[in-house]
Regions:
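Positively charged n-region of N-terminal signal peptides that target proteins for export
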Residues: 2-10
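Bacterial N-terminal signal peptides
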Residues: 12-20
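N-proximal helix/coil linker or "cap" segments that precede and/or mark the start of modular domains
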Residues: 22-43
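Short active-site neighborhood of thiol/selenol oxidoreductases, capturing the structured segment around
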Residues: 57-74
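Hydrophobic beta-strand core positions in alpha/beta domains
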Residues: 67, 99, 143-144
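Structural microenvironment flanking redox-active thiols in thiol-disulfide oxidoreductases
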Residues: 77-116, 126-133
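Thiol/disulfide oxidoreductase modules built on the thioredoxin-like
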Residues: 111-119, 125-171
Length: 175
């Protein structure tokens, strides 16, 4: 009985992955980017390390790159410099890049970002509740929220955001 349940879950997961792969391939999406259903983005109201509040509701009218990460996460550590590299490439009136640290101390976050991404001002999810609400299914995870506040794309795992294929993708969706 237990093997049947495991087999059914495995087959279901494989079908879901095949669907996501086919959807991405049919839309010409870069590797690892999944199209989402356009549901409204969950609430996101957090403070940065200076205590300044940031609310996703006030970002209406522009795309938002919402990135969940942690300093202990190996793929996050490799990916963060590529986010730092794209930060100055896009006008904040078209694309706002938001990096959200998941439940780590400010000292840990400051030490890590000072070394690899000094221009990024992280939002601090100190209690992990925003991360829980967004359900990223692992770290790193990046959601692309459209100007109407709807979830359009998800990238799970690390990727070189500063590579031509991802830069072209972002440029295309924000135009």
């Amino acid at each position: 009985m237990r093997q049947q349940g495991t087999m059914k879950r495995t087959i279901g997961l494989l079908c879901a992955l095949l669907f996501c792969w086919h959807s991405a391939a049919s839309e010409g999406l870069p590797k690892g980017i999944m199209k989402l259903d356009g549901r409204p983005a969950p609430a996101l109201l957090l403070e940065d390390m200076d205590g300044q509040a940031w609310d996703i509701g006030k970002a209406r009218g522009r795309w938002v790159f919402v990135h969940f990460w942690a300093a202990w996460c190996g793929p996050c550590r490799r990916e963060m410099p590529t986010i730092q590299a794209i930060f100055p490439q896009f006008d904040a009136s078209e694309l706002e890049i938001v990096v959200i640290n998941t439940a780590e101390s400010e000292d840990t976050v400051f030490e890590f970002l000072a070394a690899v991404a000094p221009d990024l001002n992280p939002l601090m999810d100190k209690d992990g509740l925003v991360t829980e609400r967004w359900q990223p299914r692992g770290l790193p995870a990046t959601f692309l929220v459209d100007p109407a506040g709807r979830l359009q794309y998800l990238a799970l795992g690390g990727r070189p955001w500063d590579s031509p294929v991802y830069m072209k993708f972002i440029s295309k969706i924000i135009e």
